[in-house]
Amino acid sequence: MLRRSGTVRCPGAWEAVHGHVEAGETPVAAAVRELGEETGFTAERLYNLSRMEAFYLHRTDQVALIPVFAAVIDPAALVVLSGEHDGWRWLPLAKAGQELAWPRERRSLEDVAILLGSGGAGPLEDVLRVF
């Protein structure tokens, strides 16, 4: 989990890696890029959680559609935070769900527990695993 720094909106909120898709970029490429930018991590495996979150941006009158991914990383990888965050911590899924500020991220953790709790996606591996 990452804690938002005092220099961005929602300071102090705990969240998962997230971001936006840049022009000409695929959602998968954006997920990999954001993971690297926000944590310094490289995904060993990436899963499509088969979930699409939507929310309304009232300030710009836009609807955002967000595909949700889960990354498996090397447990020995070192965290390198961007200026967007000033803290991080590893938590068990149940505890992380209590700490995350955004309800959509809590819902995604339920999918992670169900789909990847055994270390892989089981019979869905060939469908959900991106790489």
Q: Residue spans of the language-model regions?
A:
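N-terminal strand-loop-strand
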Residues: M1-E15
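Short, charged, intrinsically disordered terminal tails
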Residues: G117-V130
